[in-house]
């Protein structure tokens, strides 16, 4: 069992005493969609996690900076957390990295020996801020940030792709909730963008969406590969078939889909979980 616990108790931003008594089954801590703002608190949390072999998962956002510059807010907190990872040799996973500056910090930290991994999302690869103004956190970035994400995938800086799937209801979106659905479209978006448009080998995309996440989560002894003895978790796709996304046909409880009306290659035809078919698309 792999459980995640908040970095600070009840997300209060300062209390970390609970980390000292976490059971062995807890392998990750995260403040979810927030960054811990206090430097000393975060440093102490990193020190504890090194002792207990816990990975820190970080949404990087300096809340004092974000009201006037979202990009700088991500960059600054990414730099801080990477330095803490290097100093304490704490395993750090940077979630939904979206800026060139954050990637630069991660690359430099890795070169210095910091145990840092990172992920990017399909929507930060597909959209830039000239094409979509959609409330999501981190925000949709500039075209040069998107190009940097693609480069970081190709050079191995990026460890995996994560959907950051956020199925908010229409009512919650109307109230300003940040996020979008992206689970059902994730492979097609990434395959079309990375493989069809950017020339990424399909084998590398498969790694980023299977073995890569399994390694980050410490599940790679039984998930992420098609070999005897591993869990039979399989996705079958038609890489030659182009299809159009229709939000009203999604299975998610939410329809807040920014890809509505867009066409992609790589339609998912079947999913198998633990050897059992959990989804099968009807052929038209």
What is the predicted function of each stretch?
Residues 148, 221-224, 267:
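A structural connector/turn signal
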Residues 14-161:
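Histidine/acidic residue-rich metal-binding segments in metalloenzymes
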Residues 1-14:
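Metal-cofactor-binding active-site regions of metalloenzymes
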Residues 72-91, 154-155, 159-161, 166-239:
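His/Asp/Glu-enriched, well-ordered alpha-helical/loop segment
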Residues 130-136, 171-175, 250-255:
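Short glycine/proline- and charge-enriched loop/turn segments
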Residues 228-283:
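C-terminal cap of metal-dependent C-N hydrolases
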Residues 4-7, 32-33, 59-61, 97, ...:
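Fold-independent oxyanion-binding glycine-rich loops
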Residues 139-141, 203-204, 246-252:
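Short, positively charged
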């Amino acid at each position: 069992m792999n459980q995640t616990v908040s970095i600070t108790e009840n997300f209060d931003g300062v209390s970390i005493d609970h980390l000292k008594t976490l059971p062995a089954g807890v392998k990750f801590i995260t403040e979810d969609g927030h960054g811990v703002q206090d430097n000393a608190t975060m440093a102490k949390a990193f020190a504890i996690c090194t002792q207990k072999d816990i990975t820190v998962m970080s949404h990087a956002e300096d809340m004092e900076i974000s009201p006037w510059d979202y990009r700088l807010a991500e960059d600054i907190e990414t730099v801080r957390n990477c330095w803490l990872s290097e100093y304490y040799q704490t395993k750090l996973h940077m979630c939904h990295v979206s800026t060139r500056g954050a990637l630069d910090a991660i690359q430099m930290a890795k070169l210095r020996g910091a145990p840092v991994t990172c992920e990017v999302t399909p929507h930060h690869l597909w959209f830039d801020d000239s094409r979509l103004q959609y409330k999501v956190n981190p925000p949709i970035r500039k075209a040069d940030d998107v190009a940097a994400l693609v480069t970081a995938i190709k050079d191995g800086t990026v460890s995996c792709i994560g959907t950051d799937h956020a199925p908010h209801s229409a009512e919650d979106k109307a109230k300003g909730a940040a996020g979008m659905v992206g689970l059902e479209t994730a492979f097609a978006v990434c395959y079309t963008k990375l493989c069809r448009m950017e020339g990424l080998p399909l084998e590398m995309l498969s790694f980023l969406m299977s073995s890569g996440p399994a390694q980050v989560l410490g599940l790679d002894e039984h998930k992420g590969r098609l070999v005897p003895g591993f869990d039979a978790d399989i996705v079958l796709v038609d890489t030659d078939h182009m299809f159009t996304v229709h939000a009203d046909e999604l299975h998610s409880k939410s329809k807040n889909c920014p890809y509505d009306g867009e066409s992609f290659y790589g339609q998912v035809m079947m999913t198998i979980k633990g050897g059992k078919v959990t989804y099968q698309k009807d052929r038209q």
